[in-house]
């Protein structure tokens, strides 16, 4: 392979790579604002200037192609002087907003000013004044004074979101960003511009002024908003999810995620209507009880039913581990064949970027861990029909609000003698239930999802329930988590009394004299691997942070 030398280090590069790409691939950081690996090159910030031997002047690393034998200096006196000058130029009119800016702590301008700036200003003149609180759209606030005109947001809108909604207006130090006349910055991916903005010019109207980055823990997990399974970081402060941001995975979502997934897939975890402990219905009235009492009551009632009198509804919102335990419980404990899950497909809400029509994260995983009718068993629609006829008298539903699908299903559920629901939040289905058992949300447990392309990916706990301890669970910890005391106000975040569905099922099985006895999510997954050839050779370490494509999907991909 061809080679270049960067700061005395000889590195290999691929033909067609620029200097900044070759350096980055080999762990060498060249400062940059406007360059982004998934966007076109604009070359307008000039902070990536480097000295290249045998070239008459400094070159920008983002648009200069690497050539065999090239010698590059990123820290020479000439380079550092130019970089310092560029930083000084950018800071002339930049406001001192760091104490109130959402970007503080993850701001490239802040970082580079410390590393590459002069440390003081030579300018006494009044800074330029621009509009500071401009609502570009329903989700984005723009601060013109902070903008350094890198054009990342414009290029993202044009090239990734495929909607030309932003542009530069005016010239020189008066330049600013606006939407085109009559347009609003409202495409389904606008909040990605907040992530790629190197300063605090673009902020999320949902997250604005809510938390400092150093006060939050960050956990690598998966967005459950659709079958794409975007890789995300979940940011938590005081045991409350504050925001979600996309995490790079070239095989799934690149650097992006949709606005709907970012804003609507975590707030239910923090909601006031969380199921906190078990609920049983006695004489028509709801009664809060411990999880153990709820399980004892459920086991006692379930003993009255068997075979075709009972049905089980799993969930494409639940993990592979939850669904496997649920299916094993139904089949081994009750010899039940009436088992299925509801599908949520919206063909009108899909694009060729990220958003999928399947609005669940684990349809394939649910079906292939046992949530499907057994021999002679009924599918979801048939189960509902048999409930209407009162041939099915008992139903167990896991992590799905099936009563909200339509009024006919809601009416059918009212005819049941026994409805047991494992749920995260109060909903239309829990209101009809005779017993409600509190299930942990996806943000409170370990597990796996399989996306529409057959990539199995891990979710990890970012929020603790009553029985969990952040340090003992090996969870991500913020500065507050590490050094706070029980007397600090922010150290007393709300914890709900809930358990993962696989654990509730295991406890139910034990009460009924069954064989299920799982202690950890990994125990369930190991059993899936042993019994299902689709998962052969996998474990949590193999899946890692980027996920693994299952063998059967690899073969399909290779054939295509």
Residue ranges and their predicted role:
Residues 19-53:
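A basic, amphipathic helix-loop patch mediating RNA/tRNA/ribosome contacts
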Residues 22, 50, 156, 257, ...:
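Hydrophobic/aromatic ligand-binding patch that stacks against planar heteroaromatic rings
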Residues 34-39, 128, 521-528:
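Short linear loop/turn motifs
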Residues 62-67:
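Structured interaction patches on ligand/partner-binding surfaces of diverse proteins
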Residues 305, 322-323, 329, 333-534:
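Non-catalytic alpha/beta scaffold blocks inside enzyme catalytic domains
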């Amino acid at each position: 392979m061809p080679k270049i030398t960067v700061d005395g280090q000889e590195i290999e590069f691929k033909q067609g790579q620029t200097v900044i790409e070759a350096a980055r691939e080999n762990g060498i950081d060249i400062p940059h604002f406007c360059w982004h690996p998934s966007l076109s090159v604009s070359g307008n910030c000039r902070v990536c200037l480097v000295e290249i031997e045998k070239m008459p002047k400094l070159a920008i690393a983002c648009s200069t192609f690497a050539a065999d034998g090239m010698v590059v200096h990123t820290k020479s006196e000439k380079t550092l002087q130019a970089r310092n000058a560029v930083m000084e130029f950018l800071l002339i009119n930049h406001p001192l907003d760091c104490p109130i800016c959402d970007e503080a702590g993850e701001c490239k301008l802040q970082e580079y000013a410390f590393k590459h700036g002069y440390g003081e200003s030579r300018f006494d003149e009044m800074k330029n004044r621009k509009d500071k609180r401009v609502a570009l759209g329903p989700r984005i606030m723009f601060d013109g004074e902070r903008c350094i005109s890198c054009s990342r947001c414009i290029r993202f809108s044009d090239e990734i979101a495929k909607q030309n909604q932003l542009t530069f207006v005016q010239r020189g130090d008066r330049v600013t960003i606006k939407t085109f006349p009559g347009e609003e910055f409202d495409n389904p991916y606008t909040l990605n511009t907040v992530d790629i903005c190197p300063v605090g010019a673009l902020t999320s109207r949902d997250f604005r002024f809510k938390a400092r980055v150093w006060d939050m823990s960050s956990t690598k997990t998966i967005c459950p908003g659709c079958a794409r399974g975007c890789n995300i970081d979940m940011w938590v402060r005081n045991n409350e999810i504050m925001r979600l941001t996309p995490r790079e995975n070239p095989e799934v979502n690149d650097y992006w995620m949709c606005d709907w997934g970012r804003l609507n897939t975590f707030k239910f975890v923090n909601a006031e209507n969380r199921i906190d402990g078990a609920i049983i219905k006695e004489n028509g009235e709801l009664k809060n009880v411990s999880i153990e009492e709820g399980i004892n009551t459920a086991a006692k009632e379930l003993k009255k039913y068997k075979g075709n009198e009972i049905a089980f509804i799993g969930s494409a919102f639940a993990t592979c581990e939850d669904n496997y335990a649920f299916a094993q419980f139904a089949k081994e404990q009750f010899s039940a064949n009436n088992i299925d899950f509801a599908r949520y497909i919206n063909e009108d809400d899909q694009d060729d970027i990220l958003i999928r029509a399947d609005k669940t994260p684990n349809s394939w995983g649910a079906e292939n861990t046992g949530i499907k009718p057994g021999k002679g068993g009924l599918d979801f629609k048939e189960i509902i029909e048999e409930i209407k006829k009162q041939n099915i008298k008992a139903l167990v539903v896991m992590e799905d609000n099936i009563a909200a699908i339509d009024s006919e299903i809601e009416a059918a559920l009212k005819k049941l003698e026994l409805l047991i629901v494992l749920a995260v939040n109060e909903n239309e289905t829990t209101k009809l239930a005779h017993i409600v058992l509190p299930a942990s949300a996806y943000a409170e447990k370990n597990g796996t999802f399989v996306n529409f392309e057959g990539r199995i990916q891990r979710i990890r706990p970012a929020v603790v329930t009553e029985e969990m301890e952040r340090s003992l669970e090996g969870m991500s910890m913020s500065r507050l988590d590490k050094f706070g005391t029980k007397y600090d106000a922010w150290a007393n975040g709300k914890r709900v009394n809930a358990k993962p569905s696989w654990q509730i099922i295991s406890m139910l099985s034990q009460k009924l004299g069954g064989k299920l006895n799982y202690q950890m999510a990994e125990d369930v997954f190991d059993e899936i691997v042993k019994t299902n050839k689709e998962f052969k050779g996998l474990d949590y370490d193999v899946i890692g942070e980027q996920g693994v494509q299952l063998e059967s999907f690899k073969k399909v991909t290779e054939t295509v």
